[in-house]
Amino acid sequence: MNQNMKRLPYGINDFEAVIEQNQYYVDKTMYLPLLENQPSNIFFIRPRRFGKSIFLSMLHAYYDCSKKEKFQTLFGDLWVGKHPTPLQGKYQILHLDFSYVGGGIEKLEENFNMYLRVKLDGFMRVYQEFYLADFKERFFKSDSGTEKLALLQDETATKNLPLYLIIDEYDNFTNTVLNEQGENVYWAITHADGFYRDVFKKFKGMFERIFITGVSPVTLDDVTSGFNIGWHISTKPEFNQMLGFSMEEVRKMFAYYKEVGGIPAASDIEAMIDEMKPWYDNYCFSEDALHTQSKVFNSDMVI
Protein backbone atom coordinates (compact mmCIF):
# COMPACT_ATOMS: atom_id res chain seq x y z
CA MET A 1 0.00 0.00 0.00
CA ASN A 2 1.26 3.48 -0.90
CA GLN A 3 2.24 5.35 2.28
CA ASN A 4 1.18 8.65 0.66
CA MET A 5 -2.32 7.38 -0.07
CA LYS A 6 -4.96 10.02 0.58
CA ARG A 7 -7.21 9.17 3.51
CA LEU A 8 -10.97 9.36 3.11
CA PRO A 9 -12.33 12.40 5.01
CA TYR A 10 -15.24 10.63 6.68
CA GLY A 11 -17.10 13.00 8.99
CA ILE A 12 -14.72 15.90 8.30
CA ASN A 13 -16.39 19.13 7.18
CA ASP A 14 -13.33 21.39 7.19
CA PHE A 15 -12.16 21.94 3.62
CA GLU A 16 -8.80 23.39 4.66
CA ALA A 17 -8.07 20.39 6.87
CA VAL A 18 -8.93 17.99 4.04
CA ILE A 19 -6.55 19.72 1.63
CA GLU A 20 -3.72 20.44 4.05
CA GLN A 21 -3.79 16.90 5.47
CA ASN A 22 -3.75 15.41 1.95
CA GLN A 23 -7.13 13.72 2.27
CA TYR A 24 -9.24 12.72 -0.72
CA TYR A 25 -11.39 15.59 -1.98
CA VAL A 26 -13.99 15.28 -4.71
CA ASP A 27 -13.53 18.52 -6.62
CA LYS A 28 -16.68 20.63 -6.79
CA THR A 29 -14.96 23.95 -7.50
CA MET A 30 -16.09 23.98 -11.13
CA TYR A 31 -19.49 25.08 -9.80
CA LEU A 32 -18.12 28.37 -8.44
CA PRO A 33 -18.43 30.37 -11.69
CA LEU A 34 -21.94 28.98 -12.18
CA LEU A 35 -22.90 30.16 -8.70
CA GLU A 36 -21.41 33.58 -9.33
CA ASN A 37 -23.64 33.92 -12.39
CA GLN A 38 -26.76 33.34 -10.29
CA PRO A 39 -28.55 36.08 -8.35
CA SER A 40 -26.49 37.06 -5.32
CA ASN A 41 -28.68 35.47 -2.61
CA ILE A 42 -28.98 31.70 -2.95
CA PHE A 43 -30.91 28.96 -1.16
CA PHE A 44 -29.84 25.35 -1.72
CA ILE A 45 -31.67 22.41 -0.13
CA ARG A 46 -30.31 18.87 0.11
CA PRO A 47 -30.84 15.84 2.43
CA ARG A 48 -28.67 15.36 5.49
CA ARG A 49 -25.16 13.94 5.09
CA PHE A 50 -24.88 15.02 1.48
CA GLY A 51 -21.75 17.15 1.70
CA LYS A 52 -23.36 20.53 2.39
CA SER A 53 -21.05 21.55 5.23
CA ILE A 54 -17.76 20.82 3.47
CA PHE A 55 -19.05 22.57 0.35
CA LEU A 56 -19.78 25.68 2.43
CA SER A 57 -16.35 25.37 4.03
CA MET A 58 -14.86 25.37 0.53
CA LEU A 59 -16.87 28.49 -0.38
CA HIS A 60 -15.62 30.17 2.78
CA ALA A 61 -11.98 29.37 2.04
CA TYR A 62 -12.30 30.53 -1.57
CA TYR A 63 -14.01 33.88 -1.02
CA ASP A 64 -12.45 34.88 2.31
CA CYS A 65 -10.15 37.89 1.92
CA SER A 66 -8.16 36.73 4.98
CA LYS A 67 -7.28 33.51 3.13
CA LYS A 68 -6.45 35.12 -0.20
CA GLU A 69 -2.74 34.34 0.15
CA LYS A 70 -3.52 30.63 0.67
CA PHE A 71 -5.27 30.32 -2.69
CA GLN A 72 -2.52 28.34 -4.40
CA THR A 73 -2.04 26.04 -1.40
CA LEU A 74 -5.74 25.25 -1.05
CA PHE A 75 -6.96 25.39 -4.64
CA GLY A 76 -3.89 25.00 -6.85
CA ASP A 77 -4.61 21.35 -7.66
CA LEU A 78 -8.35 21.85 -8.13
CA TRP A 79 -10.33 23.01 -11.14
CA VAL A 80 -10.74 26.57 -9.89
CA GLY A 81 -7.01 26.82 -9.22
CA LYS A 82 -6.52 26.95 -12.97
CA HIS A 83 -9.70 28.96 -13.60
CA PRO A 84 -9.99 31.54 -10.77
CA THR A 85 -13.04 33.79 -10.78
CA PRO A 86 -13.10 37.58 -10.30
CA LEU A 87 -14.62 37.30 -6.81
CA GLN A 88 -11.94 35.05 -5.31
CA GLY A 89 -10.68 36.43 -1.98
CA LYS A 90 -12.95 39.47 -2.12
CA TYR A 91 -15.14 39.14 0.99
CA GLN A 92 -15.27 39.24 4.74
CA ILE A 93 -17.20 36.08 5.60
CA LEU A 94 -19.78 35.58 8.33
CA HIS A 95 -20.28 31.80 8.51
CA LEU A 96 -23.16 30.59 10.68
CA ASP A 97 -24.32 27.06 11.51
CA PHE A 98 -27.72 27.05 13.19
CA SER A 99 -27.41 23.44 14.31
CA TYR A 100 -25.52 24.96 17.26
CA VAL A 101 -28.64 26.83 18.36
CA GLY A 102 -30.73 24.73 20.71
CA GLY A 103 -32.46 24.58 24.06
CA GLY A 104 -36.06 24.79 25.16
CA ILE A 105 -38.43 27.23 23.51
CA GLU A 106 -38.25 29.61 26.46
CA LYS A 107 -34.47 29.95 25.89
CA LEU A 108 -34.39 29.72 22.11
CA GLU A 109 -34.26 33.43 21.31
CA GLU A 110 -31.66 34.02 24.02
CA ASN A 111 -29.53 31.13 22.77
CA PHE A 112 -29.83 32.33 19.18
CA ASN A 113 -28.75 35.83 20.19
CA MET A 114 -25.84 34.41 22.20
CA TYR A 115 -24.68 32.30 19.26
CA LEU A 116 -24.89 35.30 16.93
CA ARG A 117 -22.88 37.38 19.41
CA VAL A 118 -20.11 34.77 19.66
CA LYS A 119 -19.86 34.38 15.88
CA LEU A 120 -19.79 38.14 15.30
CA ASP A 121 -17.05 38.59 17.91
CA GLY A 122 -15.05 35.92 16.10
CA PHE A 123 -15.71 37.68 12.80
CA MET A 124 -14.37 40.96 14.18
CA ARG A 125 -11.19 39.32 15.48
CA VAL A 126 -10.47 37.89 12.03
CA TYR A 127 -11.08 41.16 10.16
CA GLN A 128 -10.10 43.71 12.83
CA GLU A 129 -7.51 45.35 10.57
CA PHE A 130 -10.39 46.81 8.51
CA TYR A 131 -11.98 48.63 11.48
CA LEU A 132 -10.95 51.59 13.63
CA ALA A 133 -10.23 51.18 17.33
CA ASP A 134 -13.23 53.21 18.55
CA PHE A 135 -15.63 51.11 16.48
CA LYS A 136 -14.10 47.85 17.71
CA GLU A 137 -14.44 49.07 21.29
CA ARG A 138 -18.15 49.80 20.82
CA PHE A 139 -18.64 46.53 18.98
CA PHE A 140 -17.03 44.34 21.64
CA LYS A 141 -18.79 46.20 24.47
CA SER A 142 -22.20 45.26 23.11
CA ASP A 143 -23.58 42.04 24.58
CA SER A 144 -26.37 41.70 21.99
CA GLY A 145 -25.92 39.71 18.80
CA THR A 146 -28.56 41.68 16.93
CA GLU A 147 -27.05 44.98 18.10
CA LYS A 148 -23.62 43.87 16.90
CA LEU A 149 -25.19 42.98 13.56
CA ALA A 150 -26.67 46.48 13.28
CA LEU A 151 -23.35 48.11 14.22
CA LEU A 152 -21.53 46.02 11.62
CA GLN A 153 -24.11 46.83 8.97
CA ASP A 154 -23.71 50.58 9.47
CA GLU A 155 -19.91 50.44 9.55
CA THR A 156 -19.45 48.22 6.51
CA ALA A 157 -21.93 50.29 4.52
CA THR A 158 -20.01 53.46 5.40
CA LYS A 159 -16.67 51.90 4.47
CA ASN A 160 -18.09 49.99 1.48
CA LEU A 161 -16.69 46.69 2.75
CA PRO A 162 -18.13 43.66 0.90
CA LEU A 163 -19.62 40.93 3.11
CA TYR A 164 -20.57 37.33 2.31
CA LEU A 165 -23.03 35.47 4.55
CA ILE A 166 -22.93 31.66 4.67
CA ILE A 167 -25.60 29.81 6.68
CA ASP A 168 -25.50 26.06 7.23
CA GLU A 169 -28.50 24.18 8.67
CA TYR A 170 -30.68 27.29 8.46
CA ASP A 171 -33.76 25.21 9.34
CA ASN A 172 -32.26 22.98 12.04
CA PHE A 173 -33.82 24.40 15.18
CA THR A 174 -37.00 25.58 13.47
CA ASN A 175 -37.72 22.03 12.27
CA THR A 176 -37.18 20.84 15.84
CA VAL A 177 -39.60 23.48 17.12
CA LEU A 178 -42.20 22.50 14.53
CA ASN A 179 -41.91 18.80 15.38
CA GLU A 180 -41.75 19.14 19.16
CA GLN A 181 -43.64 22.34 19.98
CA GLY A 182 -46.19 22.52 17.18
CA GLU A 183 -47.30 25.06 14.62
CA ASN A 184 -48.25 27.88 17.00
CA VAL A 185 -44.79 28.14 18.54
CA TYR A 186 -43.14 27.68 15.15
CA TRP A 187 -45.33 30.43 13.71
CA ALA A 188 -44.36 32.77 16.53
CA ILE A 189 -40.65 32.69 15.64
CA THR A 190 -40.92 32.62 11.83
CA HIS A 191 -43.77 35.07 11.14
CA ALA A 192 -44.78 38.64 11.95
CA ASP A 193 -42.27 39.95 14.53
CA GLY A 194 -40.74 36.56 15.32
CA PHE A 195 -37.02 36.84 16.09
CA TYR A 196 -35.95 34.44 13.34
CA ARG A 197 -37.89 36.21 10.63
CA ASP A 198 -36.61 39.52 11.97
CA VAL A 199 -32.95 38.54 11.67
CA PHE A 200 -33.51 37.53 8.04
CA LYS A 201 -34.85 41.02 7.41
CA LYS A 202 -31.61 42.40 8.83
CA PHE A 203 -29.57 40.19 6.50
CA LYS A 204 -31.49 41.54 3.52
CA GLY A 205 -29.57 44.74 2.83
CA MET A 206 -26.33 43.95 4.61
CA PHE A 207 -24.55 41.26 2.58
CA GLU A 208 -23.38 41.49 -1.01
CA ARG A 209 -23.76 37.72 -1.38
CA ILE A 210 -25.61 35.08 0.66
CA PHE A 211 -25.54 31.28 0.43
CA ILE A 212 -27.95 29.34 2.66
CA THR A 213 -28.38 25.58 2.96
CA GLY A 214 -30.74 23.30 4.83
CA VAL A 215 -32.78 20.14 4.41
CA SER A 216 -36.32 21.47 4.03
CA PRO A 217 -38.02 24.29 2.13
CA VAL A 218 -40.69 24.71 4.84
CA THR A 219 -38.90 27.34 6.93
CA LEU A 220 -37.60 28.90 3.73
CA ASP A 221 -41.13 29.64 2.58
CA ASP A 222 -42.02 31.14 5.95
CA VAL A 223 -39.04 33.42 6.58
CA THR A 224 -38.33 34.57 3.04
CA SER A 225 -41.45 36.69 2.75
CA GLY A 226 -39.50 38.92 5.12
CA PHE A 227 -36.25 38.23 3.28
CA ASN A 228 -37.91 38.46 -0.13
CA ILE A 229 -34.76 38.24 -2.22
CA GLY A 230 -33.65 34.60 -2.13
CA TRP A 231 -33.02 32.56 -5.27
CA HIS A 232 -33.83 28.86 -4.94
CA ILE A 233 -31.44 26.78 -7.10
CA SER A 234 -32.14 23.36 -5.54
CA THR A 235 -33.97 21.95 -8.56
CA LYS A 236 -32.01 23.64 -11.34
CA PRO A 237 -30.43 20.94 -13.56
CA GLU A 238 -27.00 22.59 -13.69
CA PHE A 239 -26.70 22.14 -9.90
CA ASN A 240 -28.17 18.64 -9.70
CA GLN A 241 -24.74 17.04 -9.08
CA MET A 242 -23.16 19.91 -7.13
CA LEU A 243 -23.48 17.87 -3.91
CA GLY A 244 -23.29 14.13 -3.54
CA PHE A 245 -21.13 12.14 -5.96
CA SER A 246 -21.83 11.50 -9.61
CA MET A 247 -21.14 8.03 -11.00
CA GLU A 248 -18.02 9.35 -12.70
CA GLU A 249 -16.76 10.83 -9.43
CA VAL A 250 -17.26 7.47 -7.67
CA ARG A 251 -15.54 5.66 -10.53
CA LYS A 252 -12.58 8.06 -10.35
CA MET A 253 -12.32 7.58 -6.57
CA PHE A 254 -12.29 3.79 -6.87
CA ALA A 255 -9.70 3.97 -9.65
CA TYR A 256 -7.45 6.09 -7.45
CA TYR A 257 -7.63 3.70 -4.49
CA LYS A 258 -7.10 0.71 -6.76
CA GLU A 259 -3.98 2.34 -8.21
CA VAL A 260 -2.45 3.17 -4.80
CA GLY A 261 -3.36 -0.17 -3.23
CA GLY A 262 -6.23 1.00 -1.08
CA ILE A 263 -8.44 -1.68 -2.61
CA PRO A 264 -7.30 -4.98 -4.17
CA ALA A 265 -5.75 -4.74 -7.63
CA ALA A 266 -8.19 -7.38 -8.87
CA SER A 267 -11.22 -5.31 -7.86
CA ASP A 268 -13.85 -4.86 -10.56
CA ILE A 269 -14.78 -1.20 -10.27
CA GLU A 270 -17.90 -1.46 -12.43
CA ALA A 271 -19.13 -4.43 -10.40
CA MET A 272 -18.56 -2.45 -7.19
CA ILE A 273 -20.56 0.46 -8.56
CA ASP A 274 -23.37 -1.84 -9.69
CA GLU A 275 -23.51 -3.34 -6.20
CA MET A 276 -23.72 0.10 -4.57
CA LYS A 277 -26.28 1.65 -6.90
CA PRO A 278 -29.46 0.11 -5.42
CA TRP A 279 -28.46 1.33 -1.95
CA TYR A 280 -26.82 4.71 -2.42
CA ASP A 281 -27.52 5.92 -5.96
CA ASN A 282 -31.09 6.94 -6.55
CA TYR A 283 -31.01 10.69 -6.09
CA CYS A 284 -32.09 13.19 -8.69
CA PHE A 285 -33.09 16.68 -7.63
CA SER A 286 -34.09 18.16 -10.97
CA GLU A 287 -36.84 16.85 -13.21
CA ASP A 288 -34.99 18.34 -16.18
CA ALA A 289 -31.91 16.24 -15.32
CA LEU A 290 -33.80 12.98 -14.84
CA HIS A 291 -33.03 11.60 -18.31
CA THR A 292 -29.87 13.55 -19.12
CA GLN A 293 -27.63 13.01 -16.06
CA SER A 294 -26.65 10.00 -13.99
CA LYS A 295 -28.26 9.68 -10.58
CA VAL A 296 -26.37 11.08 -7.60
CA PHE A 297 -24.79 8.93 -4.89
CA ASN A 298 -25.10 9.85 -1.22
CA SER A 299 -21.53 10.97 -0.54
CA ASP A 300 -21.56 10.04 3.14
CA MET A 301 -22.60 6.47 2.37
CA VAL A 302 -20.01 6.09 -0.40
CA ILE A 303 -17.17 7.20 1.88
Role assignments for model-derived ranges:
Residues 59, 111-113, 179-185, 217, ...:
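Short secondary-structure boundary/capping segments
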Residues 11, 27, 61-125:
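P-loop NTPase motor core
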Residues 133-153:
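Short glycine-rich substrate-engagement loop in P-loop NTPases that contacts/grips substrate
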Residues 219-226, 233-303:
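Amphipathic alpha-helical segments of the small helical/lid subdomains adjacent to P-loop NTPase cores
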Residues 99, 168-169, 203-228:
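A short beta-strand-to-loop transition that corresponds to the Sensor-1 phosphate-sensing loop
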Residues 1-63, 67, 72-81:
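Walker A/P-loop-proximal flanking segment of P-loop NTPase domains
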Residues 151-158, 185-210:
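Substrate-engagement module of ASCE P-loop NTPases
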Residues 159-189:
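Conserved P-loop NTPase "ATPase switch" module shared by AAA+ and STAND
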